[in-house]
């Protein structure tokens, strides 16, 4: 059976990572009957977060975190992602990335809505293969620039799987 779970603890804009971890531990306190830890979701990489909070949390054992290139409340721009990747390299942490091109998805979604295409099946149309492959290629390039390991998550296209394989072959 399962003896450990590692869910995501999500930071929201303006929120301290220490507060996020404390809140998630409080949610589990007295309820968890198995071991648990947290992957952190970084959505507001301020100087305070990157300079103090995240290094301290990594030292405490929170060695993996996730960033997004899409979703209004979660996405980071390339500069912010570079800052997170640089910190991960320095501190020996692992960055996971949900890679999709936000603007492509937004543009396609708006066109679909304008055309009256509102059924749930059009969600997949708005999240086109190109949106994933472009963002994954860009994120892999940023990780290669800094020579830092990266885990691209939620891979749904052969193009991205091939891109990851090529990056692994390059080392």
Where are the regions a protein language model picked out?
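Histidine/acidic residue-rich metal-binding segments in metalloenzymes
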Residues: 52-69, 73-171
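Short acidic, glycine/proline-enriched helix-loop-strand junctions
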Residues: 19, 34, 91-93
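A glycine-rich helix N-cap at a beta->alpha junction
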Residues: 27-41
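Structural detector of well-ordered beta-strand residues that form the stable sheet scaffold
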Residues: 3-6, 37, 96, 151
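Active-site mouth loops of central-metabolism enzymes
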Residues: 9-12, 37-50, 69, 124-130
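Metal-associated gating/positioning segment near the N- to mid-region
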Residues: 1-31
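Residues that form or flank phosphate/diphosphate-binding pockets in enzymes
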Residues: 15, 48, 75-76
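Short N-terminal helix-initiation segments at or just after the protein's N-terminus
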Residues: 7-9, 33, 117-121
